């Protein structure tokens, strides 16, 4: 338990286990339903979570990199406009400063941003998503998916072994007590394209990623050509790494970007 004068935060340990192909497929299906969650009936690209601005303003974070957010009720943008302006271009300056981008590299990102703004890579959301933007985790690399035994995080009544409400949604969803379930941590939640979360899972090779994709497709089929857009949707995570850590992330980012020029 962590406490301060004004508030408290209760946490519990997630005991991890080895994932399986079946667990990955179930995780993919549940991720599809998470992306489609929209109680307000609308969501724009870049939209921040409810009440976010009151505490943090309109800037989120991905590690130590700032993440521009759009206020609820802002002017809607297409995917390409949002992705260029808020998920690629803000990180070029830092990548130049640490030497991982040269002038030609920055120019390549600018050219790609123009293609994005022109709508070349706009594509429909998966079938279950009925809003402009899906509800993204936003930083869905493999380390932000923990695989835990179902009975380590919930009991049959939907409570954890620590006595707090945990994951009642797992009940009746096909997760046996001894089976691994995917638990999301450390989100950078915002409205975006569902393909971005899926692509980020494979930046650092999530286990059974093809099974995750298969489970997702069964629940919410992706738009035609999604495989060709995976590299594009990985660019945000790559350019953030180039801006934060430099080194080989710069050339890796530019190689991926040039595929779409």
Feature names for model-found ranges:
Residues 102-133, 137, 144-148, 259:
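Short, intrinsically disordered, low-complexity segments enriched in Ser/Thr and Pro
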Residues 1-77, 81, 158-160:
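ATP-binding pocket architecture of kinase catalytic cores
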Residues 231-239:
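Hydrophobic alpha-helical segments that form the core
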Residues 35-45, 95, 120, 124, ...:
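A general structural signal marking secondary-structure boundaries and capping sites
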Residues 19-26, 107-116, 161-164, 180, ...:
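Phosphate/dinucleotide-binding and metal-coordinating scaffold of catalytic cores
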Residues 53-120:
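Active-site catalytic-loop/activation-segment of kinase and kinase-like phosphoryl-transfer enzymes
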Residues 75, 79-84, 93, 129-135, ...:
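Active-site Asp-x-Gly
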Residues 165, 241-261:
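ATP/Mg2+ or Mg2+-diphosphate-binding catalytic cores
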């Amino acid at each position: 338990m962590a406490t301060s004068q004004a508030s408290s935060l209760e946490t519990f340990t997630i005991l991890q286990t080895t994932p399986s192909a079946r667990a990955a497929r179930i995780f993919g299906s549940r991720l599809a339903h998470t992306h489609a969650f929209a109680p307000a009936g609308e969501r724009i690209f870049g939209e921040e979570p409810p009440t976010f601005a009151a505490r943090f303003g309109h800037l989120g974070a991905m590690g130590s990199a700032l993440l521009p957010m759009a206020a609820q009720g802002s002017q809607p943008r297409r995917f390409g406009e949002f992705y260029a302006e808020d998920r690629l271009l803000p990180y070029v300056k830092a990548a130049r400063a640490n030497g991982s981008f040269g002038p030609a590299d920055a120019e390549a990102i600018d050219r790609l941003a123009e293609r994005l703004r022109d709508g070349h890579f706009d594509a429909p959301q998966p079938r279950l998503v009925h809003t402009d933007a899906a509800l993204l985790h936003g930083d869905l690399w493999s380390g932000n998916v923990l695989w835990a035994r179902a009975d380590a995080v919930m009991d049959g009544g939907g409570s954890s072994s620590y006595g707090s409400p945990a994951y009642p949604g797992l009940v009746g969803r096909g997760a046996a007590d001894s089976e691994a379930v995917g638990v999301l941590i450390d989100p950078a939640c915002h409205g975006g394209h569902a393909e971005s979360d899926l692509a980020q899972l494979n930046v650092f090779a999530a286990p059974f990623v093809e099974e995750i994709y298969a489970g997702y497709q069964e629940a919410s089929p992706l738009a035609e050509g999604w495989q060709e857009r995976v590299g594009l949707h990985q660019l945000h995570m790559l350019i953030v790494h180039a801006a934060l850590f430099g080194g080989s992330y710069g050339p890796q980012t530019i190689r991926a970007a040039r595929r779409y020029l």
